[in-house]
């Protein structure tokens, strides 16, 4: 699914499902399209159907990763046993928000509250 910037009237985003795109074309951000608008009787919302790409938008160019990140990624070793490890521990809390649970455990009958 996706959304079309629909600039007629109150200028909003119009939902469309990928099945509504004609000829199986994969749309990209910036593509110009033609479509029909339908009203869903159940939800009362409009959506686009019979979506055709009129012309392709500008190709998106991915920004290169910053040098500091590239250098950091090169230095990571996943199987280094001597690397520092982080382990987060927290004490359990009782139902009354007290720290931990009592060491004494009572045997209770099912369905009996004391």
Curated annotation (Swiss-Prot):
Subcellular location: Cytoplasm; Cytoplasm, Stress granule; Cytoplasm, P-body
InterPro entries linked to this entry: CSD, CSP_DNA-bd, NA-bd_OB-fold, SUZ-C
Keyword annotations from UniProtKB, A to Z: Cytoplasm, Phosphoprotein, Repeat, RNA-binding
GO cellular component terms attached to this protein's record: cytoplasmic stress granule; P-body
Ranges in a coiled coil: none
Gene Ontology biological process terms from the UniProt entry: stress granule assembly
Ranges of residues in domain SUZ-C: 64-105
Residues found modified as Phosphothreonine: 77
UniProt cross-references to SMART domains, sorted A to Z: CSP (SM00357)
Any one Gene Ontology molecular-function term assigned to this protein's record: RNA binding
Location (main, coarse): cytoplasm
Domain CSD, first and last residues per copy: 1-51
Pfam families according to UniProt: CSD, SUZ-C
Family that this chain belongs to: Belongs to the UNR family.
Subunit structure: Component of a multi subunit autoregulatory ribonucleoprotein complex (ARC), at least composed of IGF2BP1, PABPC1 and CSDE1. Interacts with STRAP. Part of a complex associated with the FOS mCRD domain and consisting of PABPC1, PAIP1, HNRPD and SYNCRIP. The interaction with PABPC1 is direct and RNA-independent. Interacts with EIF4ENIF1/4E-T.
UniProt xrefs under PANTHER family: COLD SHOCK DOMAIN-CONTAINING PROTEIN E1 (PTHR12913:SF1), UNR PROTEIN N-RAS UPSTREAM GENE PROTEIN (PTHR12913)
Functional description taken from the UniProt entry: RNA-binding protein involved in translationally coupled mRNA turnover. Implicated with other RNA-binding proteins in the cytoplasmic deadenylation/translational and decay interplay of the FOS mRNA mediated by the major coding-region determinant of instability (mCRD) domain. Required for efficient formation of stress granules.
The protein's name: Cold shock domain-containing protein E1
Organism encoding this protein: Cavia porcellus (Guinea pig)
């Amino acid at each position: 699914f996706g959304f079309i910037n629909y600039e007629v009237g109150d200028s909003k985003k119009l939902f469309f499902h990928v099945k509504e795109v004609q000829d199986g074309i994969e749309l990209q951000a910036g593509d110009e399209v033609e479509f029909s608008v339908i009203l869903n009787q159940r939800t009362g919302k409009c959506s686009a159907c019979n979506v055709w790409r009129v012309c392709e938008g500008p190709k998106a160019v991915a920004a290169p990763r910053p040098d500091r990140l590239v250098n950091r990624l090169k230095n990571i070793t996943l199987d280094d046993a001597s690397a520092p490890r982080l382990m987060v521990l927290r004490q359990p809390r009782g139902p009354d928000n007290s720290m931990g649970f009592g060491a004494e455990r009572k045997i209770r009958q099912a369905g009996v509250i004391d």
